[in-house]
Amino acid sequence: YSDDGTANKLLAGNTDKQQIWVDYIQAHNDRDLDGIATVKADDWEGYLPGGGVIKGNTAYIEFLKDWFASSQNPKWKVMWMIANDGAANGGATETWLTTGNDITFNDADGNQVTEHHVHDIQFVGNKIKRINVYSRLSQKE
């Protein structure tokens, strides 16, 4: 929706961005910090489930270095993707990819935990400009 409350059209997006995301997630699983950095725009922003915000490639790479060095050992698996384009305020078209991803990591007690994440990813060209992350714990069987 626009700032005045009118609905913006949502269109099927370019599925070419899906492979960029798959490669980006694989770079995380491979701990390939250079590969991760090359996909992001310099002014990238990430909005985390707990309310945290990471701005810029350098800050994100430092965040990942610490996380990858921890005992959590995070691993991601892409479950689904939906590509969409839509008009933003002012009429410019934005390119987004919405993805469902499972992340598995070790908690403080060493137990393996799985969370289901939805990532809304904004692309500018072939670079990731913004990621909004939403999360819920996996159901216990």
Task: Place the predicted regions along the sequence by residue.
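Short beta-strand edge/turn micro-motifs at domain boundaries
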Residues: 114-141
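Short, low-complexity N-terminal intrinsically disordered segments enriched in polar/charged residues
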Residues: 1-34, 38
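Surface-exposed, charged secondary-structure patches
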Residues: 64-109
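Hydrophobic pocket/interface hotspot
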Residues: 24, 35-37, 44, 60, ...
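Short beta-strand segments enriched in hydrophobic/aromatic residues
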Residues: 40, 97, 101-105, 119, ...
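A short gly/proline-enriched turn/hairpin at secondary-structure junctions
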Residues: 7-10, 43-55, 70
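Acidic helix-start/capping segments at beta-turn-to-alpha-helix junctions
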Residues: 39, 47, 51-56, 79-88
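Sec-exported extracytoplasmic/periplasmic mature domains
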Residues: 25-30, 38-45, 65-73
